[in-house]
Amino acid sequence: MTEAQSKGLNGLELDVAIIGAGVGGLYALYCMREKLGLNVQSFDMASGVGGTWFWNRYPGCRVDTESTVYTYSFDLDMFQNWKWSERYARQSEVLAYMNAVADKHDLKRSINFNTRINRAAWDDASQRWVLTTANGETVRARYLIEAVGLLSSSYAPKFPDQDKFKGQVLVAPKWPEENPDLSGKRVAVVGTGSTGIQIITEIASKVGQLHVLQRTPQWVVPLGIGPFPQEARDRINLDPIAFRDWALDSGTVFGFKEGTTSALALPPEDRAARYEKAWQKGNGFSFMLETFSDITVSPEANKTATDFIKSKLDAAVMDPKVAAMLTTTDYYARRPLAADGYYEVYNRPNVTLHDVKANPIERYTEKGLIVGGQEIELDVVIMATGFDAVTGNYLKIQTIGRGGANLAEQWTGGPRTFGGMTIAGFPNFFMVFGPFSPFTSQPLVHEWQVNYFTDLIEAAEKTRSIVDTEVSAQDNWVQICQDGLAGTLFQITDSWINGANIPGKPRTSMWYMGGMAAYMTEMNAIRDDNYRGFKVG
């Protein structure tokens, strides 16, 4: 629906309301409408489909998941015949794919764009969710599905006196549709996470001066950008369902099987050869998880990986002082970063690296930024400072469950869910890739989760039952997830994985770390035991 068509929502009665029109939201809409035949409408504050791929259109934006698994499998024709041009698709190509899926299945007619949901409250008397839009209109639905995104709630701290700056401040996840021309300009990029390194490598050769404002250096490996491999296309065409099941039957669903050999089990020369092969192949997740089994759990194994990356860094960066600034003593236990030619960027005469932990960003001036007491004159400041990941978008909606239970209050000490899909005391409420979902790539896992709760809703519909979650089952799931993170180096390395990147956010587990194959086994056992842990009645 267009903005004009989405007006007049007040009093709308639905079977299902879906918040979000990204990867998970589109498939949830398809399942509720086409599989179950329910009266369903979706709501998204964007003007089009895509979710995070609608908003994140900054220079260099692309997936760092193999395009082979960044796709739906429910439409076998598109799964086999969509012509990805690159091994790692650019944002524009991902968005084109999602629009093609939505158009083929006529999903947009059931989506209210430019519509923000501010509040969702369960009414026990009518057994309905009451949604309130930013315009004050109310919509009622028997089921509520939130597909609001893992990395969609951007975090961009404001430095003092920003209003004085005569240049332009751009927030990467809210990049203007009319792409600003950065050619020849003096640009600062604040942040060197996944977004930052993509922007830096993309614009370094185009801008006049590039100032990289780095707080925390991170280990970076090549991505391996190139044409979509024909052998991958052939494998999908041969048996698409077998390929999908092979991808899901893994730890992280990134299109490879995780390593089974300890990094400490090989002689140094053999270990180095394996790292070199992974380096030449590219992909951060592959380097971290496919090479060896214990990089994320053993400090000693982790050091073998960081020693190798450090040797590559030192060989690539000509200035030893800059190489030292790019080196971290932290474990290789954040979201793995990958970008082709990242370290080599710092050999360019127009690129300057600043350590803003030692010399903090103080404030804006008319001409730029004061960093460590020195003014840097700038035309553009790009904020690439990350996301309030996992929980951020859920908490932007005031969500009220049974008995007036407030989700934000319940999650004060950290999120609590069952299987990453439901919350005790919030009836007929489902999440796509909510907190305590598996630590994986997303599209195929979104599909799996939506299929799971579609079956649960179908079972409930037969008797018009309400679906809720037992507190004990939720507590047990949260404990399993907390124990799983505690056994990894992710637990003791500050990052968005454990919420440490957001001031005041609880530092806690937000993931099921047992891998997708184990997750499916756990959740299928629950289903086969009459949906043990769910309350259907």
Residue ranges and their predicted role:
Residues 11-13, 167, 184:
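A glycine-biased structural micro-motif
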Residues 200:
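Ligand/cofactor pocket segment of small-molecule handling proteins
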Residues 179-187:
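Glycine-rich NAD(P)-binding loop of Rossmann-like domains
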